[in-house]
């Protein structure tokens, strides 16, 4: 369902407001953190694709993220040919998290990764993909340190 097709109910607003309050308490303490969401899809167009919508990520950083994710997948025993990695702004995506970027938490963060994982990665290959994603997420800190060390004046993600 597209974001503009969703029906917003008073109960949904109440739950979201409560969630956003907790989010604010955590995120506002350290806005240098990456915000990460993991979702799943079963869309036929993305059967063998891991799509990553982003916030605050330029093309150079997206290339680094894609490379680090491929390395993490390989380390977890997943063939690079098993999955097509699509990441904004380098690739077009089916799932762009547009509603979340417009009205959700992604609207309020400096940097974010919103992952849409295909069904087989969440079911048949769950242990391998879980290990790969954990390794990838741990590597985000080293990416930040590398960017900080290269250019202390940099304001890019």
Residues covered by each model-derived region:
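N-terminal catalytic or cofactor-binding beta/alpha core of small enzyme domains
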Residues: 1-157
């Amino acid at each position: 369902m597209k974001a503009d097709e969703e029906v917003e109910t008073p109960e949904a607003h109440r739950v979201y407001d409560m969630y956003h309050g907790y989010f604010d308490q955590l995120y506002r303490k350290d806005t240098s953190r990456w915000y990460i969401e993991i979702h799943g899809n079963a869309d036929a167009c993305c059967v063998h694709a891991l799509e990553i919508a982003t916030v605050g990520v330029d093309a150079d950083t997206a290339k680094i993220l894609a490379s680090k994710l491929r390395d993490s997948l390989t380390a977890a025993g997943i063939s690079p040919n098993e999955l097509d990695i699509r990441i904004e702004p380098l690739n077009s995506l089916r799932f762009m998290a547009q509603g979340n970027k417009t009205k959700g938490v992604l609207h309020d963060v400096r940097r974010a990764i919103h992952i849409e994982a295909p069904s087989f990665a969440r079911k048949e290959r769950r242990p391998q993909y879980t290990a790969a994603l954990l390794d990838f997420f741990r590597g985000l800190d080293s990416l930040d340190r590398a960017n900080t060390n290269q250019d202390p004046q940099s304001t890019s993600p």
